[in-house]
């Protein structure tokens, strides 16, 4: 049989047998296409968690919370599979909605949307929600903002206060926002105004409240995390604003005189394609040209529906890291020199 450098690693067909999710993922490392990429993402994420003094960022876009991914993200926060979350405001609004005891509902993408509108039901592809309940949450956020009073703060600071308030109201720790508050995991929302949280804050503004979310402070704070971390890894669920907000930290640090060399690990689950030129499908190889990803970084991009990938990946990681005593970063925001980071089990 002819062998050369290209034919030293044969594929191994998947056997059907009793095994764990992590064992299935290990087996898929010897298959092909996006199945192998999914397995490689688990391998890379697991290695990233074992890497000493690494700060793991997650960018969360798409309607992941309405689609049922909320407890997966909060589990990853509690178990410190991620150390900093950058999210769309919509995901966090929907998280607050459920934290307050309300629901999203199994629906159909074939439903009559005019009838849904008449009944006050909103549709997110095949998920339904009650518009009146959303508006109640909008006004609750407005009321909460008025309780805070007239301040200027970053979205991280605002989400911390919101998590504290939801916890005070008895929200369970399966909430993303509450878990982040209790476990000192910062949440940044770079497009907070583009969400129902922004609607709530607009209601408060119309009532006369002067509360400003300082988005430039957001940029500064998250860049400080990158600058003061020994190494960094990124995980993107979808792309969009959260992806670029994290990616640009390396460029900003370089412009400010701290050329860190790019993120050391990079994983993405996306259904977008690179040939359209948009960031959501942009490859990590392209990001190397910008200095956002280190040339030697472990890079895995999986072209997949994230609602398929996340449950599989989360269960595999849970099995692999169950006994791992990870050294996770602890953030101290009020020091004399700004942010300080310590690494503790």
UniProtKB/Swiss-Prot annotation:
Disulfide bonds: none annotated. Its cofactor is NAD(+). It comes from the Archaea. GO terms for biological process: spermidine metabolic process. Keywords: Hypusine biosynthesis, NAD, Transferase. The active site is at 292 (nucleophile). InterPro entries: Deoxyhypus_synthase_arc, Deoxyhypusine_synthase, Deoxyhypusine_synthase_sf, DHS-like_NAD/FAD-binding_dom. Its EC number is 2.5.1.46. One of its GO terms (molecular function) is deoxyhypusine synthase activity. Pathway: Protein modification; eIF5A hypusination. It catalyses: [eIF5A protein]-L-lysine + spermidine = [eIF5A protein]-deoxyhypusine + propane-1,3-diamine. It is an enzyme of class 2 (transferase). GO terms for cellular component: cytoplasm. The keyword NAD applies. Belongs to the deoxyhypusine synthase family. Catalyzes the NAD-dependent oxidative cleavage of spermidine and the subsequent transfer of the butylamine moiety of spermidine to the epsilon-amino group of a specific lysine residue of the eIF-5A precursor protein to form the intermediate deoxyhypusine residue. This is Probable deoxyhypusine synthase 2.
């Amino acid at each position: 049989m002819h062998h050369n450098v290209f034919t030293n690693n044969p594929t191994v067909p998947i056997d059907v047998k009793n095994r764990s999710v992590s064992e299935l993922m290990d087996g898929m490392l010897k298959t092909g296409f996006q199945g192998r990429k999914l397995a490689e993402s688990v391998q890379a994420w697991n290695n990233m968690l074992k890497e000493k003094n690494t700060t793991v960022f997650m960018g969360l876009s798409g309607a992941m919370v309405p689609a049922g991914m909320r407890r997966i993200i909060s589990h990853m926060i509690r178990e410190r599979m991620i150390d900093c979350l950058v999210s769309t405001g919509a995901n966090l609004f929907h998280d607050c909605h459920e934290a307050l005891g309300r629901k999203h509902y199994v629906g159909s993408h074939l439903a009559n949307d005019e009838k849904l509108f008449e009944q006050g039901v909103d549709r997110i592809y095949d998920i339904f929600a009650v518009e009146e309940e959303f508006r109640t949450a909008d006004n609750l956020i407005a009321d909460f903002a008025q309780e805070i009073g007239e301040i200027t703060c970053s979205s991280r600071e605002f989400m911390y206060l919101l998590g504290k308030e939801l916890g005070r109201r008895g929200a369970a720790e399966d909430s993303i926002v509450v878990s982040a508050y209790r476990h000192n995991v910062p949440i940044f929302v770079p497009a907070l105004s583009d969400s129902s949280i922004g609607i709530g804050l607009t209601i408060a503004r119309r009532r006369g409240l002067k509360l400003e979310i300082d988005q430039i402070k957001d940029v500064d704070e998250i860049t400080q995390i990158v600058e003061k971390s020994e190494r960094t890894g990124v995980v993107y669920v979808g792309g969009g604003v959260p992806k670029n907000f994290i990616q640009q930290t390396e460029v900003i640090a370089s412009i400010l005189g701290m050329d860190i060399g790019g993120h050391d690990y990079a994983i993405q689950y996306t259904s977008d394609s690179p040939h359209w030129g948009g960031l959501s499908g942009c490859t990590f190889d392209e990001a190397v040209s910008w200095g956002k990803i280190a040339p030697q970084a472990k890079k895995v991009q999986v072209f997949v529906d994230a609602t398929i990938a996340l449950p599989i990946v989360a269960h595999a990681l849970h099995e692999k890291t169950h006994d791992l005593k990870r050294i996770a970063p602890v953030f101290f925001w009020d020091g004399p020199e700004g942010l300080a980071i310590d690494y503790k089990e």
